[in-house]
From Swiss-Prot:
Primary subcellular site in the record, as a coarse category: mitochondrion
UniProt keyword terms in alphabetical order: Aminoacyl-tRNA synthetase, ATP-binding, Ligase, Mitochondrion, Nucleotide-binding, Protein biosynthesis
Pfam families to which the protein is assigned, alphabetical: tRNA-synt_2, tRNA_anti-codon
Tree of life domain: Eukaryota
Annotated protein name in UniProt: Asparagine--tRNA ligase, mitochondrial
Length: 441
């Protein structure tokens, strides 16, 4: 039985180009130059960064215009400019089919330069730009590499719920979930059933607690899931809806194991991307060993700096974005693990590492600041003097044959912004960014 085959993509074409091959490609005209006797059009299909130059006759290109979606059949030939180090191949068009055109002078994605701020106002159309395509391919291949890394370490990918009855981080920055117009729904008219579920429900800020339950049955687990935080933040690092990679490991007994896992994961991703011909100027530095220091050492180093701080570093206070970036960009010029934070500024589930500290770690990276955070988790019931009442189920994990364990969470959008460099805003690393005061489509 003949099976329908998807058309050849430019990505597959560039992997194995053959001079003289008859091919058919689909894509969009990214630029066009019409001369007296010939026309040159650059066509891209979004599957790779490299477009294909199409050579046509003036007659063939009469209706061809910028932005048109096309199918072009022809012969692949060695380009006349190949010896100059330019594109090696070009397509000599024999047949052109135009699917759609842009016949509106008000089309916002013109050939002129548009700032990221302007493009952010039209997220449904900015996806057509070369820069956004490059970022989302980087995101896709990064996620693929992350999954390959965890598979190589015998992790199980899981899907914990995104509707939850608790605030894992305890910060209170949650979105409450309620059905629309519940007063019209007869099932909610009884006094004893005021909620769709039997209690208040929220969009999750972290799947960590559910992952811990999974880890205590599957040993090593991870998820790549959406998370939601109702933060009143207008920074280049914050989103209301974002994606988190979270991992939990049973029988983890030291922070060194956790930091090694985090460092190995990101370096594996970098190496995988470079094998696929991705590269950014700052990546080579990232493959060198990273710095690890305690929170107390970080405060000591920052306090010794002769600088006017917006928020002076003080033991017992959290590190600000200014402190984080100064540590990794100025003092050490490399990613920095900061460990053993004061217990009073960290969530209830973190294991003690001293009289006033917990076995927590934050990974700080240049341009972004905090990229990931994790900890060893409390693993004995008597360690929980106080806890939210809705988390009685979580205490059952300690009650019934618990094991030492730890884990971390990493923001995907921050990771892509970090990999992309050039102080990329996280709003450029997700297709339809949601942030305070801004939602589109």
């Amino acid at each position: 039985m003949n099976k329908f085959q998807l058309p050849k993509t430019l990505k597959s074409l560039w992997h194995h180009p053959h001079n003289g091959e008859l091919i058919s490609i689909n894509g969009w005209v990214r630029s066009i130059r019409k001369l007296k006797n010939v026309c040159f059009a650059m066509v891209s299909d979004g599957t790779c960064q490299q477009a294909l130059q199409v050579v046509t006759s003036p007659e063939q290109s009469k209706k061809l215009s910028y932005g048109a979606s096309v199918n072009i059949e022809g012969q692949l030939a060695v380009s006349k400019n190949a010896k100059l180090g330019l594109q090696q191949y070009e397509l000599l068009a024999e047949k052109i089919k135009i699917y759609g055109q842009i016949n509106d002078d008000n089309y916002p994605i013109q050939k002129k330069h548009l700032t990221t701020e302007m493009l952010r106002q039209i997220p449904h159309l900015r996806l057509r730009t070369a820069k956004q395509g490059e970022i989302f391919r980087l995101r896709s291949d990064s996620l693929k590499a992350l999954r390959q890394f965890f598979s190589s370490k015998d992790f199980t990918e899981t899907n914990p719920p995104i509707i939850t009855s608790s605030d894992c981080e305890g910060a209170g920055e949650v979105f409450t979930l309620t059905p629309q117009e519940t007063h019209k729904n007869k099932s909610f008219e009884r006094d004893d059933q005021k909620h769709f579920f039997d209690r208040p429900a929220f969009l999750t800020v972290s799947t960590q607690l559910h992952l811990e339950a999974l880890a205590l049955g599957l040993s090593r687990v991870y998820t790549i899931s959406p998370a939601f935080r109702a933060e009143q933040s207008h920074t280049s690092r914050h989103l209301a809806e974002f994606w988190m990679l979270e991992a939990e490991v049973a029988f983890m007994t030291s922070l060194s194991q956790l930091t090694s896992l985090m460092e190995d994961m990101i370096k594996y991703t970098l190496n995988s991307l470079m094998e696929q011909n991705y590269h950014r100027d700052h990546w080579d530095q990232l493959l060198k060993p990273w710095k690890c220091m305690t929170y107390s050492e970080a405060i000591e180093e920052l306090s010794a700096v002769k600088k006017t701080w917006k928020y002076p570093p003080k033991w017992g206070n959290d590190l600000s974005s200014e402190h984080e970036k100064y540590l990794c960009e100025i003092l050490h010029k490399t990613p920095v693990f900061v460990t053993d934070y004061p217990q009073k500024i960290k969530p209830f589930y973190m294991k003690s590492s001293g009289p006033d500290t917990v076995a927590a770690v934050d990974l700080l990276v240049p341009q972004v600041g905090e990229l990931a955070g994790g900890s060893l988790r409390k693993d004995h019931l008597d360690e929980y003097k106080t806890y939210p009442p809705e988390l009685q189920w979580y205490l059952d994990l300690m009650k019934y044959s618990n094991a030492p364990h730890g884990g971390f969470g990493l923001g995907i959008e921050r990771l892509i912004a970090f990999l992309e460099g050039e102080n990329t805003n996280v709003k450029e690393t997700i297709p339809f960014p949601r942030s305070v005061g801004s939602i589109f489509a």
